[in-house]
Swiss-Prot record:
GO terms for molecular function: magnesium ion binding; terpene synthase activity. Pfam families: Terpene_synth, Terpene_synth_C. This is Probable terpene synthase 3. The lineage of its organism: Eukaryota, Viridiplantae, Streptophyta, Embryophyta, Tracheophyta. Binds 3 Mg(2+) ions per subunit. It comes from Ricinus communis.
């Protein structure tokens, strides 16, 4: 049912306040320039090791199962981007020459790697591991490596794959109950908390270094290459952060819009997580600035703006007319000027690259964004709590996921053609809808309590509680169940679009959801960035890996 905005009673016009804590990082990345003396030496060493690893991948003497294990390690160590062509060829060969005479570890690994690569292989391959009663065979509980491999594979499931649902429960139960000798306890506990499918590649690489190093069969040149590469890329990212910090300081939002979260480095975590590879330097720059700009917009709508100011601001953005800025209050004027300048920067860079079409889609995305935000502002102003379905239909936009994807594509050069943008804006778009809804629910489950304390539109939690007259815990249970199913839908849609969209585009879509899963795993670590996210960023940007 449509919301009767005008008929509903309205709140008194009082500005809310959130009292966000100040920046953790300040101008750290400007004042602490990295020592790049070792980078040239690291690059020379890495170049030699890279060729050695390449020879391992294409070796004719290694069995397919051995190559798959090697590829899995390469991907987990975060260096697969150096060997995409070779990995693709091996995966295609393995897909074309299936060998059923393998153990649980190998079959589950093969299944996962093929699905990760976009091959829609059948989960029936796991039927052989069930007994006549339809249960997984009891002897499998003693095969810890096999259980781990099956556990990881189960997260590649799509709707209707009952055997993978059963595999997940079976492996969880027995992995949690099993006492293991080193290094498997670390690997097991990490897999239970961060399965490969949901882990952020750059973060997972750092955490896998110690696990792989404890493996008695680890390949030393491979491990050394991964560590060198991590440190080389870290120096590049440090430089990115100094540029972004300078841009942020020049905007002076901490003074002009002091009510907003000062989180520019935390905003850059999205970019570092999605585009850690060196080649995507412009994409990182665009996405870092986009998250920072949109975070302030979110606080304008959710924290500071009155409904009258927000209605006017929405109209100004929808018209995209800089001459209207003088109608806005000063804080909105400053913000709108920064938004216009950011878009002008994108337009200039994409036009130079022969992609002037990008800016049209970017503008359409921000207009959709303010329409979604003003809808929520009206709901809050009128004390209206929508049904979950009505909420989600708007929240997939207000989540910022669609605009972040759009702006990310602007920075991706040749991979994001006009056809890709046309696909993105085609409705219905189940892949975009699923990823956006998933991002929104992950956020809501962890952040809604703090938001409600300061005054905020009803989240998915409050909407579900009111609609179904249930407790908060019951709402959590149901929404977490929806999240599980949306991950399955996301897996299915990514499989469908493989071959239609370039792999970097699909990786971008997946990685933004993964970032949300990291940021909101236990709490809203973006808003409260003094804890886990600070440590992750220090790992990404400050602390080199001992080689």
């Amino acid at each position: 049912m449509a919301l009767p905005v005008q008929a509903a009673p309205q709140r008194a016009q009082v500005r809310r306040t959130a009292q966000f804590h100040p920046s953790v990082w300040g101008d750290y990345f400007i004042k602490n320039a990295p020592d790049n003396k070792m980078v040239s030496i690291w690059k020379e060493q890495a170049k030699v090791l890279e060729e050695e690893v390449r020879r391992m991948i294409i070796s004719e003497t290694q069995k397919p199962s051995g190559k798959l294990k090697l590829i899995d390690v390469i991907q987990r160590l975060g260096i697969a981007y150096h060997f995409e062509e070779e990995i693709g060829e091996v995966i295609e060969q393995v897909y074309s020459n299936y060998d059923d005479d393998e153990d649980l570890y190998d079959i589950a690994l093969r299944f996962r790697l093929l699905r990760q690569q976009g091959y829609n292989v059948s989960s029936d391959v796991f039927d052989k591991f069930k007994d006549c009663k339809g249960d997984f065979k009891k002897h499998l509980v003693n095969d810890v490596q096999g259980l781990l491999s099956l556990h990881e594979a189960s997260y590649m499931s799509v709707q209707g794959e009952k055997i993978l649902d059963e595999a997940l429960e079976f492996t969880k139960t027995h992995l949690m109950a099993t006492q293991l000798s080193s290094p498997l306890p670390d690997q097991v506990s990490h897999a239970l908390r961060w399965p490969v499918r949901r882990g952020l590649p750059r973060k997972e690489a750092w955490q896998y270094f110690s696990i792989y190093q404890q493996d008695r069969e680890h390949i030393e040149p491979l491990l050394k290459l991964a560590k060198l590469d991590f440190n080389i890329v870290q120096k590049l990212h440090h430089k990115d952060m100094s540029i972004i910090t300078r841009w942020w300081i020049d905007l002076d939002f901490t003074t002009k819009l002091s009510f907003a979260r000062d989180r520019v480095i935390e905003c850059s975590f999205w970019a570092l997580g999605v585009f850690y590879e060196p080649q995507f330097v412009f994409a990182r720059q665009v996405l870092s600035k986009a998250v920072a700009i949109l975070s302030v917009m979110d606080d304008i709508y959710d924290v500071h703006g009155t409904i009258e100011e927000l209605e006017l601001f929405t109209e100004v953005v929808e018209r995209w007319d800089i001459s209207m800025k003088d109608q806005l209050p000063d804080y909105m004027k400053w913000y709108f000027e920064a938004l216009i300048d950011f878009y002008a920067e994108i337009e200039a860079e994409t036009t130079k690259g022969g992609r002037s079409f990008c800016i049209h889609y970017a503008k359409e995305a921000v207009k959709k964004q303010v329409r979604a935000y003003i809808t929520e502002a009206r709901w809050f102003n009128n004390d209206y709590v929508p049904t979950l379905e009505e909420y989600i239909s708007n929240a997939v936009i207000s989540s910022t996921y669609p605009i972040l994807i759009t702006l990310s594509f602007c920075g991706m050069g040749k991979f994001a053609s006009k056809d890709v943008f046309d696909w993105l804006f085609t409705e219905p778009n189940k892949l975009l809808y699923t990823a956006s809804g998933l991002a929104r629910l992950i956020d809501d489950i962890r952040s809604h309590e703090f938001e409600q304390e300061r005054g905020h539109v009803a989240s998915a939690v409050e909407c579900y509680m009111k609609q179904h007259s249930v407790s908060k815990q019951e709402a959590y249970n149901e929404l977490n169940s929806i999240v599980v199913n949306m991950w399955k839908d996301l897996n299915e849609e990514l499989l469908k679009e493989t071959g239609v969209l370039p792999k970097p585009i699909l990786a971008c879509i997946l990685n933004i959801v993964r970032v949300m899963d990291v940021v909101y795993k236990d709490e809203d670590s973006y808003t409260n960035s003094r804890n886990s996210l600070k440590d992750i960023l220090a790992t990404f940007l400050v602390n080199p890996v001992p080689v």
